[in-house]
């Protein structure tokens, strides 16, 4: 095997080992008790949405039962879900944040 062929095989092997991480949707679920303003605050604080984006997502949550806050690799999505759920409980709201594979 020539040196060039060997290098090409190594490059192909390395490329095959690197996969894009699985992505996950972070979702806010509607409930009858959490104020709309609090949902907007969550979207701005944890997902860096501007007021217009946050309002659009909040209305989707209100009308459709859930809304996508963002799509992230698993570790980031899991952390955001935990942060949002903890913040909601600290503020005595039943808001539920969850994740699902994108």
UniProtKB/Swiss-Prot annotation:
- PANTHER family, per database record: ATP-DEPENDENT CLP PROTEASE ADAPTER PROTEIN CLPS (PTHR33473:SF19), ATP-DEPENDENT CLP PROTEASE ADAPTER PROTEIN CLPS1, CHLOROPLASTIC (PTHR33473)
Q: Which family does it belong to?
A: Belongs to the ClpS family.
Q: What superkingdom does the record give?
A: Bacteria
Question: Which Pfam families does the record associate with it?
Answer: ClpS
Assembly with partners or alone = Binds to the N-terminal domain of the chaperone ClpA.
Q: Which GO terms describe its biological process?
A: protein catabolic process; proteolysis
Gene3D superfamilies (alphabetical) = 3.30.1390.10
Matching InterPro entries, A to Z? ClpS, ClpS_core, Ribosomal_bL12_C/ClpS-like
Taxonomic lineage is: Bacteria, Pseudomonadati, Pseudomonadota, Gammaproteobacteria, Alteromonadales
**Entry function:** Involved in the modulation of the specificity of the ClpAP-mediated ATP-dependent protein degradation.
* SUPFAM superfamilies given in the database record: ClpS-like (SSF54736)
Q: Name the chain's protein.
A: ATP-dependent Clp protease adapter protein ClpS
Q: Which organism is the protein's source?
A: Shewanella halifaxensis (strain HAW-EB4)
